[in-house]
Amino acid sequence: MIRAFDAFSLPLLRLFDAEDAHRLAIQGLRLLPQVKPRPDDPKLAVRAFGLNFPNPVGIAAGFDKNAEAPDALMRLGFGFVEIGTVTPKPQAGNPRPRLFRLERDEAVINRMGFNNDGSEAVLRRLAARAQQGGILGVNVGANKDSSDRVADYVALIETFAPVASYFTVNVSSPNTPGLRNLQQAAALDDLLARVIEARERVRPSAGDTPVLLKIAPDLTLGELDDVVHIARSRKVDGMIVANTTLSRSPLLRERTRMNEQGGLSGRPLFRLSTRMVAETYVRAEGAFPLIGVGGIDSGGAALTKIRAGASLVQLYSALIYKGLGLVESIKTDLASTLLRTGRDSLAEIVGADAPTITAEEWPV
């Protein structure tokens, strides 16, 4: 069924503006038959952040910003779904056009600006599907015009704790002016302290919801030292590495699009984000697991991310070019690798290549 859907939808969606195509894709997912996914190979199961993931392949925030199709995505075989970024108040985001395909590079540039329906509408949707199960993360961010951005994060933790499997604190989007300043040491320490306090306040009624921190790939190694140190000291449950990049590789082929303002994702981000996964893994010293994001478009790419230090991986941009069948393809490749190498689980290879990767020349 998925192959047929991809064969029909991918050429059709290319005829539309990138954002319109995305909107159509979300609507199309909601129309798919409610067929149970094929059972995952038990060897692909991952335990991380106190949660049991059926497989390590998730969909990154940004695809289903408003929690319109999380269950359809789970039925497609994703091991977990992350919705958002959600802000307290509804937000229109930046003016269009704000989403661009770089087709020859299999990349995307976006400057969306946290466009979303706001916490009230998204909470209503999540509450309505609360009995469906599955691991559903909520990616939270601050409103652009907020006078107290930290208070926005705190409010969102308190709002979504009853329905979130985990939280992602997004301080790394490049498309909200000043947001990345929250990655600076003093600001980040204050933010995480208040977020963890909020989580503790709602624990009696909502349980112990893991809190993850999502970082940019553009941090210097000195800045990464500070970020990981603070994350460890504030006892966050994990990190997501990494968001989109503001850098532009000279190897990009779509010269007319490459200088569009915004964050770059997709295949050109793979080497940089993988290096940042390895650097973070080495610094975390086993304190918490990582989710690796950026340029994963095959089973081999997912395996590289895992061997760099990621316990789980997330996709988004590659789905635009490879289709939804990519999910099962990656899982099949990972299971085959475990069988071929005589491994019982992916946990046995997490971080195996991190020392080698961190010793390599910095990626261009």
Curated annotation (Swiss-Prot):
Monomer. It catalyses: (S)-dihydroorotate + a quinone = orotate + a quinol. GO terms for molecular function: dihydroorotate dehydrogenase (quinone) activity. CDD domains: DHOD_2_like. Pfam families: DHO_dh. Binds 1 FMN per subunit. It is a peripheral membrane protein. Pathway: Pyrimidine metabolism; UMP biosynthesis via de novo pathway; orotate from (S)-dihydroorotate (quinone route): step 1/1. Catalyzes the conversion of dihydroorotate to orotate with quinone as electron acceptor. InterPro entries: Aldolase_TIM, DHO_dehydrogenase, Dihydroorotate_DH_2, Dihydroorotate_DH_cat, Dihydroorotate_DH_CS. The gene is pyrD. It comes from Rhodopseudomonas palustris (strain BisB5). This is Dihydroorotate dehydrogenase (quinone).
